[in-house]
Curated annotation (Swiss-Prot):
Location of the motif Nuclear localization signal: 86-88
InterPro entries named among the record's database cross-references: Helicase_SF3_DNA-vir, P-loop_NTPase, PPV_DNA_helicase_E1_C, PPV_DNA_helicase_E1_N, PPV_E1_DBD, PPV_E1_DBD_sf, Rep_E1_papillomaV, Znf_lg_T-Ag_D1_dom_sf
Places the protein is found: Host nucleus
E.C. number(s) listed in UniProt: 5.6.2.4
Full protein name: Replication protein E1
Residues modified to Phosphoserine: 92, 106
UniProt crosslink position (Glycyl lysine isopeptide (Lys-Gly) (interchain with G-Cter in SUMO)): 554
Native species: Human papillomavirus 52
Top-tier EC class: isomerase
Record domain SF3 helicase: where: 447-597
Similarity annotation: Belongs to the papillomaviridae E1 protein family.
GO molecular function, one term: DNA binding
Amino acid sequence: MEDPEGTEGEREGCTGWFEVEAIIEKQTGDNISEDEDENAYDSGTDLIDFIDDSNINNEQAEHEAARALFNAQEGEDDLHAVSAVKRKFTSSPESAGQDGVEKHGSPRAKHICVNTECVLPKRKPCHVEDSGYGNSEVEAQQMADQVDGQNGDWQSNSSQSSGVGASNSDVSCTSIEDNEENSNRTLKSIQNIMCENSIKTTVLFKFKETYGVSFMELVRPFKSNRSSCTDWCIIGMGVTPSVAEGLKVLIQPYSIYAHLQCLTCDRGVLILLLIRFKCGKNRLTVSKLMSQLLNIPETHMVIEPPKLRSATCALYWYRTGLSNISEVYGTTPEWIEQQTVLQHSFDNSIFDFGEMVQWAYDHDITDDSDIAYKYAQLADVNSNAAAFLKSNSQAKIVKDCATMCRHYKRAERKHMNIGQWIQYRCDRIDDGGDWRPIVRFLRYQDIEFTAFLDAFKKFLKGIPKKNCLVLYGPANTGKSYFGMSLIRFLSGCVISYVNSKSHFWLQPLTDAKVGMIDDVTPICWTYIDDYMRNALDGNDISVDVKHRALVQIKCPPLILTTNTNAGTDPRWPYLHSRLVVFHFKNPFPFDENGNPIYEINNENWKSFFSRTWCKLDLIQEEDKENDGVDTGTFKCSAGKNTRSIRS
């Protein structure tokens, strides 16, 4: 074994020898060397620091401090890991009866010092669970004993290190408490949602248990509470018997049809109501109304619209309506009759595409969206429209219908002369117009009416060099108003020079009887002078059409409005003989209310053409048989045979 540190009396060995030698040298009285202090006392105090062991103590202190800091940091990491996994820490029994922060906070919040008393910080303000190796508490106890048995320097160092660890632990515990408060709020909201869902689940379960059918099989759920509907299915749980008996009378002022069933369960009377209101209502409005009538909370009701296209659901309402468990009043909804009554089953037919095209042709609808929207609105009165809504290829049907309708219209327009086309347009406009405002407006602009009729007759016939009318004048004189009203009546097309960079900007002229270019500028006049002289003459031109080869057509009559008189401008001498110019000199007049004095609309143009039909030399070719039926009516759908039921 090693010798113990220090001296313990006179023994054999080096230590005892040094002690004897010192005594002998002191007694012999020999000369003392200069290195020794002759004033030193003989008490032996000069040998206290002879062996320097401070280095050993410092090393031990550093190791212990590092271990303590490491343990504190591991404790913090464990706390964060546990809080991240659990999210919710239940309160311990010890803290259940405490006040203040310890009453409402987590178990670790009790280690946070909130008073002004001087309390020594603990080594571990937050409890750390055992790591699993079984020696965590032993190491903590040994570390505390070592700290108490060291010198002052080590105590100060350990207190500083423990203070740092304690402050870090306090901050971590405070942040954990904040996270717990946020998690508590989230948990409360989740509990509220769970509570509401559990009530709804209970209502649905009781309904299926009582009525023997799932409520969700009878309805089509609405996600939004703002969606409006006239027909609603309502479940009400916990209704008193007296209120359930009087509900049929209470609901009549608000509805036009009601189907009421009442059965008893362990939660009270459970009602099932199919109702059609007088006007559309959303779920929130229906919920408030029924809550007042039934005297139950809104959470005790389930409200959804019924399935309208399910034959099974319609049969359920029809059969239960005939039984003695239901009370029904009002007219049965059409969606129930169509799927249950025999006559409606006979009316159901397979979708006829030709009938849909005929409808679009008769109503002069060629736009895809208009065809889809307006034809779907006929589903209640038209069996073919109802069959169209049941189809899974509605988009393709609509696109094909619009394409076929445009083909028929284009061919029909192509085979009409200008007189037939004007008569065709007049037949689609109501009577009651007056031709006088048009004549008065021309006279107001100092335009001779006879000269205008002569030029207008040649314009409509497309005579070369007379195929283009130019309305020239300063701004705000009514040029565009006059020209646009005529184009609107004749169902012409308007082309704009802004699209001249495109190869297809003249394509609308291929499907029109009359065309118009509004507000022609000098740049546009230059373009017309360079590339469109033959178009102004009314001759055949070649037009680039999208997705097709070049199309050769006769250019329809053109109306141009401009602020530049190209008929006399020397910059375009080759246009002088191709233009018929009418000068609009005076500003367009308005009355005190801002309305035009000379109103020019479709009805007035119809009256104008009817009045000047002979002067314009518009000959209508009538092709009628002896019975007076017009053979020119186009039919694109096959005829129908009347079906009869044989007994």
